[in-house]
């Protein structure tokens, strides 16, 4: 290990696998987005069959994210975790200090496969930097109150920089805001309601993810085709924006959204929902999902019924990519790259060396297509591994990520 001392106060036992990726869960007071939307259809005219737009929807953010998908990022071509789209640099000279450094990390959780892959990748990034003398980590285990306490505790540990992945947006805002005057804060994955962190690191975002899948279906499904939309749960910001983007696209195209159902990220429930819709409608022409973790279960519902699998979107989990390849699916995999877990460590060191960083560090978020599927399909990696980890050249790969 290149750093002289590394103490992880809590790495949290792996909780039950859930299908949320980089999500926060502050439900709006009006409950917008709650409940099943399977009865949202408003007749054969195709108008607003997807129900009301989420209260999370912000038109300007939607437009900005869709535009960023085609912008050329700056940074090393072979290191997308160091690239940035439309970077607006901030001066960090006031934080410059001599090393070695003590970095601290308040992690929301390691309670799903996406976060587990990211956490392994972050640890490997830390191990590459001999100037990191100590890496102190507290895992909030998906609990807001614990993370608030964790952030306060870390401020008393003599951290040179504090990395935060907040469990939820609004609830963690005061804790992050309170830390900013005391230590440079690097925020990533999920946002909070203050711009006081030195930098906020994230992929393009939920609108881009949702649009990639929905636009694919508008190209692959005939006019009037029946679309089933599968969501995990309401009130989760990045999932709400994924659906908001898809809803906008479906509402503006001649596709028949026959149902919008919540699966709770459960494979068995997903399979049951899809099977019920097959029995009820006979034909489903396209599947849209706000997270790919249950995509294989949805595919299996068609296979069990002896029906061809319609066009659909998944995500960059290996089980879906392998099913796509083996079954020759018509598919796309929007991504929320786990390589973003490398970037906060890099950003913290740049800040402590007085180097500028983007105020909002927008990382590229490339979809996986039929043309590049083979590039991301990794033989020997476990089913729940995420392909866009940016970890292939790191020490310990593939074994530390569960591969062979």
Regions found by a protein language model. Give the residues of each.
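Hinge/cleft segment of the Venus flytrap/periplasmic-binding protein
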Residues: 41-101, 341-404
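Hydrophobic alpha-helical segments within soluble ligand-binding/sensing domains
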Residues: 90, 147, 201-227, 241, ...
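Hydrophobic alpha-helical
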Residues: 164-179, 246, 263-323
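C-terminal motif of bacterial Sec signal peptides marking the signal peptidase cleavage site
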Residues: 18-22
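Bacterial lipoprotein signal-peptidase II cleavage site
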Residues: 23-36
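Flexible loop/hinge segments that line or gate small-molecule binding clefts
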Residues: 64, 169-208, 318-330
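Extracytoplasmic "Venus flytrap"
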Residues: 41-95, 100-121, 125, 129, ...
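An alpha-beta-alpha
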Residues: 103, 122-124, 211-260, 348-351, ...
